[in-house]
């Protein structure tokens, strides 16, 4: 549900805005592996030669957005391994037994990646939220990241000084259609005025920039990026509690892919050895300083 970014000034890890429908607490929950596709097994069989299961034998073809933005991919160059998702991709590749030189990158739109049918890549990552509806069309690995929702506004707005959910009840708030952000807005904040719903994130951001709405609900990494680089005098009021509808991001694979189990095992191993936590701290560290609204 989100792709739009560029690294910002002294931000140890600014955040991202993914064009299209990306939505979006950091880390994974104890039951995270349940979010993966039902066909996923706990680990890959030791007898499986993963390199013979890929779309191009001996190579691992990984897809991401076009373009891809910070902090997920730095400078739109996933091959650099810089940015949270670029780094995760190479870490997964290594766990699967591929060297960096054996990784091939492709670009796709967000929507085409989660559309049913054959894929020209082995897995795709661009902040895909794991949902039951999407699992009907594609496979997911276990989650590599979980994010909360946040409320973004601009300095001088009626809600700029809001310190609680109650302070937001009467505000003009908006979010993108079909996102966890919109669901959290309606269920957690439950504003007295109907939420403004936008067809895409670009429209939502433009509405906030033009002060047609007073606050925008997006995933926290996106809010951090927008406040620093896109919205003039942008400010984050706070994030919603962990249980308020955080998205779990998973790697997308073709439905029924023989790589789903090995890739999930790789993600689980990266979680177990704290690699994911280390990469999160490196690229998404700003998230921890945003207050939680109660």
Model regions and ranges:
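Extracytoplasmic small-molecule ligand-binding "clamshell" domains
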Residues: 35, 44-124
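Extended ligand-binding regions for polar small-molecule ligands
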Residues: 86, 90, 94-95, 179, ...
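Periplasmic-binding protein-like
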Residues: 66, 146-153, 221, 228-268, ...
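Ligand-binding clefts/hinges and TM-proximal coupling segments of bilobed small-molecule sensing domains
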Residues: 51, 180-196, 235-236, 267-294
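Bacterial lipoprotein signal-peptidase II cleavage site
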Residues: 20-35
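A ligand-binding cleft/hinge motif common to bilobed small-molecule-binding domains
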Residues: 112, 128-137, 186-187, 214-245
């Amino acid at each position: 549900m989100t792709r739009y970014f560029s690294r910002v000034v002294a931000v140890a890890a600014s955040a991202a805005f993914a064009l299209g429908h990306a939505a979006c607490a950091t880390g994974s929950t104890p039951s995270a592996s349940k979010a993966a596709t039902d066909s996923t097994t706990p680990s890959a069989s030791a007898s499986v030669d993963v390199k013979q299961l890929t779309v191009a034998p001996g190579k691992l073809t990984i897809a991401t957005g076009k373009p891809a933005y910070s902090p997920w991919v730095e400078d739109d160059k996933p091959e650099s391994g810089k940015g949270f998702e670029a780094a995760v991709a190479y870490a997964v590749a290594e766990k699967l037994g591929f060297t960096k030189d054996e990784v091939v990158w492709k670009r796709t739109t967000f929507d085409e990646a989660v559309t049913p049918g054959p894929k020209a890549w082995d897995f795709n990552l661009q902040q895909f939220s794991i949902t039951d509806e999407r699992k009907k069309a594609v496979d997911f690995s276990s989650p590599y990241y979980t994010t909360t929702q946040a409320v973004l506004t601009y300095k001088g707005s009626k809600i700029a000084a809001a310190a609680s959910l109650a302070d937001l009840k009467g505000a003009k708030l908006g979010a993108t259609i079909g996102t966890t952000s919109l669901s959290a807005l309606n269920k957690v904040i439950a504003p007295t005025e109907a939420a403004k719903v936008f067809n895409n994130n670009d429209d939502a951001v433009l509405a906030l920039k033009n002060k047609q709405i007073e606050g925008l609900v997006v995933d926290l990494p996106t809010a951090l990026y927008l406040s620093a680089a896109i919205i003039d005098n942008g400010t984050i009021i706070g994030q919603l509690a962990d249980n308020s509808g955080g998205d779990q991001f998973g790697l997308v694979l073709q439905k029924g892919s023989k790589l789903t189990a090995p890739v999930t095992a790789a993600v689980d191993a990266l979680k177990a050895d704290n690699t994911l936590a280390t990469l999160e701290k490196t690229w998404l560290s700003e998230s921890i300083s945003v207050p939680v609204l109660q």
